[in-house]
Regions:
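Short, gly/Ser/Thr-rich active-site loops of penicillin-recognizing serine hydrolases
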Residues: 263-265, 270, 357-389
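Intrinsically disordered, low-complexity acidic/polar segments
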Residues: 336, 348-350, 366
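Long, highly charged amphipathic alpha-helices
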Residues: 187, 285, 354-358, 362
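Beta-lactam-recognizing serine transpeptidase/beta-lactamase-like catalytic domain environment
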Residues: 5-8, 12-345, 384-389
Length: 389
């Protein structure tokens, strides 16, 4: 066909040959080969969508997956062996078992702590000096040697300014004018616990335990150090951000029936805790900053539903790409759903932001479903591989 010939012309190099790289890239773009089949970075991901008003899990997705029908009753042994040997690890639930540092998606925790403890107010500005030199081996802002200038907490969320949150983490660590690392860790964990990041979410399948930081409050304040959470745990956290402080215990079950269809037991999410000590002005500052994040990311351009969110990247292995993360909610003024998504070794959060935008298009019927599910893979461009938070 003409379209097929055009595609082939696009992937030929100057000599007229089709390189192996371009050939494979085109196959992936046209959904003829899946990332899981390649088992190259990135080839796995997860996404959790939640009703922020009730805590109901609307979707808890791990990729790659498999056909459970072929493993029920009479097990298809050949299929099982293929899955078992698959280098993309389809048996591993990336939504509930994979833990990584949350990266900058954690910054709303630090903002909550700084604002509530009186370290900063919504209008307090901090000058980004590039490198934070109040501690040994001072960490740098991602924009170093440039600077974000003098910004407040909402703008710091918008710009994902590491220096701003280093300073908040440092000030949270002060005891009688002296820097105390243990106290800083305690303060950060106090607020991450309020968001439910100290415990499992309650789902009835295998879930890894969250790990709160035990050291380095300066880098912990930007979601690094040894903070480590699953996607479903980040979902519970951002759901609480969206609804201004209600933390839910999740369930994956709806009801149990007998063989005649009679309901024996029903299941609903329950409220774990409410964050009554967080002021309305604090929520306003956080929500405003998250809205500005979306406004500065082109992945959300053209969406007719306003949303708010936070990007994040986390390095786990120096020889592999960063993990990419995104948490957010929509609509902005009257939230219905939250989203938490991670692409392991996904380079940067531009890729997860693109995924979140596609979820919004699907949920709010902003684009034809068949185009979203059966069209081409998104082409986020070279900018998606640039470090920006």
């Amino acid at each position: 066909s003409t379209s097929r010939r055009q595609r082939q012309m696009c992937i030929r190099d100057r000599s007229g040959s089709i390189s192996a790289f371009n050939f494979i890239k085109e196959k992936v773009k046209n959904l003829e080969i899946t990332p899981a089949q390649l088992a190259l970075d990135p080839c796995s991901g997860s996404c959790v969508i939640t009703d922020v008003k009730t805590g109901e899990l609307l979707a808890c997705v791990t990729y790659p997956g498999y056909d459970t029908n072929r493993l029920a009753n009479t097990v298809d042994s050949n299929y099982y062996n293929l899955l078992y040997q698959d280098l993309s690890n389809p048996f591993y639930n990336n939504a509930t078992q994979q833990t990584t540092a949350p990266g900058s998606t954690f910054k709303m925790v630090t903002a909550s702590a700084g604002l509530t403890e009186g370290i900063i107010s919504p209008g307090t500005t901090i000058l980004d000096k590039g490198q934070f030199e109040e501690v040994a081996n001072g960490p740098k802002c991602w924009i170093y040697p440039s600077s974000h200038g003098s910004i407040n907490v909402s703008e710091a969320l918008r710009d994902s300014c590491n220096y701003f949150f280093y300073k908040v983490g440092y000030d949270l660590s002060m005891v009688n004018g002296t820097y105390n690392e243990d106290h800083g860790v305690e303060m950060i964990n106090k607020y991450s616990s309020m968001y439910g990041l100290d415990s499992k979410t309650g789902i009835e399948i295998a879930e890894s335990k969250p790990k709160q930081t035990t050291e380095f409050p300066i880098t912990s304040a930007i979601g690094q150090s040894n903070n480590s959470f699953t996607t479903v745990q980040l979902s519970r956290y951002v759901t609480a951000v969206a609804n201004s402080g209600t933390v839910y215990n999740y369930t994956l079950l709806k009801q149990v029936t007998d063989s005649d269809g009679n309901v024996l037991e029903t299941y609903e999410p329950t409220v774990k805790n409410t964050m009554d000590n967080i002021s309305e002005s604090t929520w306003d500052a956080i929500h405003s900053g998250m809205k500005m994040v979306v406004e500065t990311h082109e992945q959300f351009d053209g969406l007719t539903v306003d949303s708010a969110g936070k990007t994040g990247t986390a390095q786990q292995v120096p020889t592999r790409p960063n993990h990419a993360l995104y948490v957010g909610y929509a609509p902005y003024n009257n939230p219905e759903i939250s989203i938490a998504t991670r692409i392991a070794y996904g380079y940067t959060s531009a890729n997860t932001a693109e995924l979140a935008a596609s979820v919004y298009k699907y949920y709010f019927h902003l684009e034809d479903t068949s185009t979203l599910l059966d069209g081409q893979a998104e082409d986020v461009g070279a900018a998606a591989n640039a470090f920006n938070d």
